[in-house]
Regions:
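Cytoplasmic/organellar membrane-interface segments at the starts of transmembrane helices
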Residues: 2, 132-134, 187-259
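Hydrophobic transmembrane alpha-helices and their helix-loop junctions in integral membrane proteins
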Residues: 1-190
């Protein structure tokens, strides 16, 4: 029920605060406790992916669907944090940045859609693709980007997370990858229900204003730039994530030797 600005703040910044706290404080300050908790945390990540996906399936409110999909995608970050892999940790950093951009854009587009239709109920939408230039196409791009469209930052982040976490927990990664399939289903269903099908109303709809279009296109450019050239982000986070990985890997090795 939050306004669009509050939803963008939640998706782009506040949702990442917990992950930042885990990487910055929980793992370095409590490596042994984190190592004990790691298997549980990784399975909780899988649960978050599946739970968020199934809740997204059940939604008729488009904004609530985007919110639950954000919960699902953050499950990948939780898996990466407790994998003990440097590659996965760097993937988590990229994923948090990319998800912040894509989720923020989707919330902005939901707000723009609400301003024109005065409803967020997808059952009252449909038949909009040909009547609203730009907005449906941009929504489709960001929905695909959130799934990990190659060429976007989400693809780089999720790929690094899955590749880095696989040696530590193969079954967790396999199930998490299946969650991407669920994500594709509910995202494409959202686009189909909101923009395609028979029109529920023939009332004229206002096209996107230049300010609205430039705002989301700017986010799209940043997302593509992060996907095509993520090296500056990886270089910037390399030293910090290496330190976190060293502390956590040492605790994991010690725990394995004791057992």
């Amino acid at each position: 029920q939050a306004p669009t600005a509050g939803s963008v703040d939640l998706a782009g910044i506040l949702l990442k605060t917990a992950a930042y706290g885990l990487m910055r404080f929980a793992l370095p300050l409590f490596p042994n406790a984190s190592a004990e908790f790691a298997p549980i945390a990784m399975w909780l990540g899988v649960f978050a992916i599946a739970y968020g996906a199934f809740l997204s399936f059940a939604q008729t409110d488009i904004k609530r669907l985007v919110a639950y999909s954000s919960v699902s995608h953050m499950g990948f970050v939780l898996i990466a944090i407790y994998s003990g892999s440097h590659i996965a940790l760097q993937g988590a950093v990229v994923q948090m940045m990319a998800h912040g951009l894509s989720a923020a854009a989707l919330f902005i587009l939901c707000g723009q859609l609400y301003e024109r239709l005065h409803t967020r109920d997808m059952r009252e939408m449909g038949g909009i693709w040909a009547r609203l230039p730009w907005l449906p196409a941009v929504s489709l791009f960001f929905a695909a980007a959130a799934l990990g469209l190659p060429g976007t930052g989400n693809f780089v982040g999720e790929f690094l997370i899955l590749i880095g976490s696989f040696p530590a927990a193969p079954w967790v990664v396999v199930l998490a990858a299946c969650g991407l399939v669920l994500g594709s289903v509910y995202s494409l269903a959202m686009i189909h229900r909101a923009y395609f099908g028979p029109a529920k109303s023939e009332a004229p709809l206002q096209a996107m204003k230049a300010r609205e279009l430039y705002m989301v296109l700017g986010l799209a450019v940043l997302l593509i730039l992060l996907g095509v050239y993520p090296q500056p982000v990886l270089d910037t986070s390399a030293a910090s994530m290496h330190g976190v990985q060293q502390w956590f890997s040492g605790a994991l090795t010690q725990l394995a030797s004791v057992r």
